[in-house]
């Protein structure tokens, strides 16, 4: 059985890890052994934060909708309840965008919600 020398594969693996660690500070960016751990940890953070990002954006949308609804004399909770009763199926992302960029349209939605809650 022939002898296997691993110089090429090892160098390729090291290059790959160091490329992923590009921009890291200190030895984390240029020493393979340290960079390997840093890249693994970065991957864990990336995996975790891809999930956290969804929660953070939802919180942001709700905060924006709440602020806009309060300007129109309602709380977010009342507004959400009224949307359901009025069968208005607009998601939070779109509602927050409307609230930020087109307050007149948001006010008309609030008027529809208030009318449905009053009835």
UniProtKB/Swiss-Prot annotation:
SUPFAM superfamilies registered for this protein in UniProt: Ribosomal protein L20
One Pfam family per UniProt: Ribosomal_L20
GO molecular function, one term: rRNA binding
Similarity section: Belongs to the bacterial ribosomal protein bL20 family.
CDD domains named among the record's database cross-references: Ribosomal_L20
Species of the source: Albidiferax ferrireducens (strain ATCC BAA-621 / DSM 15236 / T118)
GO cellular component annotations of the record: ribonucleoprotein complex; ribosome
Function per UniProt: Binds directly to 23S ribosomal RNA and is necessary for the in vitro assembly process of the 50S ribosomal subunit. It is not involved in the protein synthesizing functions of that subunit.
Highest taxon listed in the record's lineage: Bacteria
This protein's name: Large ribosomal subunit protein bL20
GO process annotations (BP): ribosomal large subunit assembly; translation
Alphabetical UniProt keywords: Ribonucleoprotein, Ribosomal protein, RNA-binding, rRNA-binding
């Amino acid at each position: 059985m022939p002898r296997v020398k691993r110089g090429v594969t090892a160098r390729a693996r090291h290059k790959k890890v160091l490329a992923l660690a590009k921009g890291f500070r200190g030895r984390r960016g240029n020493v393979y052994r340290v960079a390997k751990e840093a890249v693994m940890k970065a991957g864990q953070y990336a995996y975790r934060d891809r999930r956290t990002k969804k929660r953070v954006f939802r919180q942001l949308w709700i905060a924006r909708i709440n602020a806009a609804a309060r300007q129109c004399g309602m709380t977010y909770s009342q507004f959400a309840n009224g949307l359901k009763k009025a069968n208005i199926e607009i998601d939070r992302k779109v509602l927050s965008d409307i609230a930020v960029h087109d307050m007149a349209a948001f006010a008309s939605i609030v008027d529809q919600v208030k009318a449905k809650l009053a009835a």
